[in-house]
Curated annotation (Swiss-Prot):
Keywords: Acetylation, Manganese, Metal-binding, Mitochondrion, Nitration, Oxidoreductase, Transit peptide, Ubl conjugation. The gene is SOD2. The modification N6-acetyllysine is found at residues 68, 75, 114, 122, 130, 202. Disulfide bonds: none annotated. It comes from Pongo pygmaeus (Bornean orangutan). InterPro entries: Fe/Mn_Superoxide_Dismutase (IPR050265), Mn/Fe_SOD (IPR001189), Mn/Fe_SOD_BS (IPR019833), Mn/Fe_SOD_C (IPR019832), Mn/Fe_SOD_N (IPR019831), Mn/Fe_SOD_N_sf (IPR036324), SOD_C_sf (IPR036314). This is Superoxide dismutase [Mn], mitochondrial. It is an enzyme of class 1 (oxidoreductase).
Amino acid sequence: MLSRGVCGTSRQLAPALGYLGSRQKHSLPDLPYDYGALEPHINAQIMQLHHSKHHAAYVNNLNVTEEKYQEALAKGDVTAQIALQPALKFNGGGHINHSIFWTNLSPNGGGEPKGELLEAIKRDFGSFDKFKEKLTAASVGVQGSGWGWLGFNKERGHLQIAACPNQDPLQGTTGLIPLLGIDVWEHAYYLQYKNVRPDYLKAIWNVINWENVTERYMACKK
């Protein structure tokens, strides 16, 4: 399982593409809770399929793609390397995003953060309620599939909300360091909430692991 309080994400999926020559295969991280632990907000069937099928598929496909990329590197086949970039982005992003997502959730979650994270939220968004409204709106507004994110802009030292399509990883595509991700692919909620994404988003706030989000925030400030 990925460390809960790590500032970056690419370092968590070691080795990076630059070290494919001696790479180790990625593996599906264990959940830090049972599949049914987030009920009634997210049911066990969704969690089991989401983790053991969808996330597992990203991991498997990432490993296959990296093997092909390694072969292309060895052959000096730049065309093949370029052709593999979309699969690396999609499956690598899926693995990064979900590895963060599982730790962002907890059966003991919900409520509000405390301490420096809460103060930063108030500073950058006006209040915790306004922050929730903005992140919810960004997540609802994702067209098709994607993610809503709370990220940290290290250059400016501020929190920032962003939405990413498909499995685009936040840090790799925007430079923001991910603190809290909300998966709005239909496989994350459809079996329970059908096509009513706002109901799912209302429910997920009850299981947000603010301790984990705070650890990520504090790590990024160092």
